Amino acid sequence: KEITEAPESFQKTLRGKIVDVDGNLHVQLDESAFPADLKNQFRDGGFKEVYVIGQGTAAVAGSSLASLLSEEISIRVESLPSTELSGFRLRADMSDTLVIAISQSGTTTDTNRTVDLVRSRGASVISIVNRRDSELTKKSDGVLYTSDGRDIEMSVASTKAFYSQIAAGILLAITISDAINGPLNGQSNFERRNKLLLGLRELPDLMREVLSGQERISQIAAELAPAKKYWAIVGNGLNIV
């Protein structure tokens, strides 16, 4: 169930956030997710670094956000476990820092503790979370919900949560990039953005197509799994995640 509901959860995460303006696709997040004061701070050069944090699967999902965002903006972007930020990267004054905290439940102890520590030092926080009114949402300046923020049946295996966190992360990365760089210009930039967002919008149907081949997938797994002792999964760019 956690796997088969992934396309719907992914689609809910995107709903209403990708809009067509004059034939070009744009990301549109409301102020509850990306407040105007944070947008202005990015525009005015007030942020010098962005940390993307989480624990376990959420930290892995965060690496996709950091990878895309680091390609789009010139300020430093780093993805790391929450415990690493709280243990080794804190500064007395972090008012020039945005922390993006990712948590399915919004109650991840290490992540919430780290958020408390960075906020006490002046950092701003945007959270990507599934659970509405969870502890993390109350500690954040902005909240971007995965699914519709009401998907309480999330497995520890974290399949649909993981996919939805990646979707939300891409939307947020594009929004931050636009806040810093201003409106897109140049045909090549529009083409690149349209390709990314169109691909994102088409993914739920492609996921359903893959899941419809479950019987064939089982056959392939039964044939190959016993045949090899070591396996490697490789990729480049966003495909690393």
Roles of regions detected by a PLM:
Residues 36, 45-199:
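Glycine-rich phosphate-binding loops that contact phosphosugars or nucleotide phosphates
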Residues 1, 6-51, 142-241:
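Active-site phosphate/pyrophosphate-binding segments
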